[in-house]
Amino acid sequence: MQTRKTFSWIKEQIARSISVSLLIYIITRTSISSAYPIFAQQGYENPREATGRIVCANCHLANKPVDVEVPQAVLPDTVFEAVVRIPYDKQLKQVLANGKKGGLNVGAVLILPEGFELAPTDRISPEMKEKIGNLSFQSYRPNKKNILVIGPVPGQKYSEIIFPILSPDPATNKDVHFLKYPIYVGGNRGRGQIYPDGSKSNNTVYNATAAGIVSKIIRKERGGYEISITDPSDGRQVVDIIPPGPELLVSEGESIQFDQPLTSNPNVGGFGQGDAEIVLQDPLRVQGLLFFLASVILAQIFLVLKKKQFEKVQLAEMNF
C-alpha cells in the first residue's frame, strides 16, 4: 500500500514538473517572439515617420538591403502575395543577449494602403499556405489593419516572407478608389544596437566615457568587463561597464582618448527599407480593354479577308 502511494506521489510530481516546464517555455518563447514588434508598437503610433523613415532604424543602426515584390495590379476583393526578401549571409552568427553566438533572426513591417489588410485564413489557397509556412502575422494596431508586423523569426528559414494580402472593394468601401498606391516595407536581420529607452544592447561597440590610462580591467564572472580609466592629471577614476559579447580592444596601462572604442563592433545584421507600387484595377476598365483588343483583332481579320477578296477580284478581271 505504501509503495502504491509513493508511486502515485512520484507520478504527480513528474506531471507537475512537466506542466511547469511547458508553462515556462511558452512564456519565454512568447516574450522572445513578440519582443521586436512590441518595441515599435509600444513606442510609436505610426511606424513610418513624416520623413519617410521607418522607426525600426532607430534601434537597428546598420543599413542593409531589403526587397518587396507585389503584383503590378490587382482586382478588388482579391487575395495576392506580397513577398519581402531580407538577404544576408546564412553563415554569419550574431551575439545573443547572454553573450554567446547564435543564428540571426529576421523581422519585417509591411505598410499597405488604407483598406488593404491581412487575408482571412479561409480566403488563402492551400498553395499560398504552404509558402507562408508557420508564420503568424499581426496588425500594428487594432485600428491599423493595413500595417502588418512579423518577427523575430529564424532567418535560416524565413529570409523570404510571404504576406497574404486582401485587396479592398470600392463598391463596399467608399474610402477606397481605383488608383495607384504606394507600399512601404522595412526589414531587419539580427538584433538591434539600441533599446527603446536609449540604452545600448550588447550587440554594438562600446566607447570610453573618459580620457586617461586603463588602470584596471576586471573580467566579470558571467562575462563582460569592468574597465577602470584613471585621469593622470587629477587621479579621477571612471569605470566603464562592458556587457558579455563585444571583444575587448584595450589592455591595462594603455592610454586612451575620450570616445575611443573599447570593444569591437559585434553587429553583423542591419535594417533596410524599400517601397513598391500597386494598382487597384477597375474590372470594368479591364473588360473595356479586352473588348477593345478583341475589336482590334476582329478588324485586322476582316481587313485581311477583304484584301484577299479584292485580290481575287483583280485576278479574275485580269483573266477576263
UniProtKB/Swiss-Prot annotation:
The keyword Cell inner membrane does not apply. It is found in: Plastid, Chloroplast thylakoid membrane. Binds 1 heme group covalently. The chain crosses the membrane at residues 286-306. Heme binds at Y36, C56, C59, H60. Its cofactor is heme. Residues 1-35 form the signal peptide. Keywords: Chloroplast, Electron transport, Heme, Iron, Membrane, Metal-binding, Photosynthesis, Plastid, Repeat, Signal, Thylakoid, Transmembrane, Transmembrane helix, Transport. GO terms for cellular component: chloroplast thylakoid membrane. Its main location: plastid. The 4 large subunits of the cytochrome b6-f complex are cytochrome b6, subunit IV (17 kDa polypeptide, petD), cytochrome f and the Rieske protein, while the 4 small subunits are PetG, PetL, PetM and PetN. The complex functions as a dimer. Component of the cytochrome b6-f complex, which mediates electron transfer between photosystem II (PSII) and photosystem I (PSI), cyclic electron flow around PSI, and state transitions. This is Cytochrome f. It comes from Jasminum nudiflorum. The lineage of its organism: Eukaryota, Viridiplantae, Streptophyta, Embryophyta, Tracheophyta.
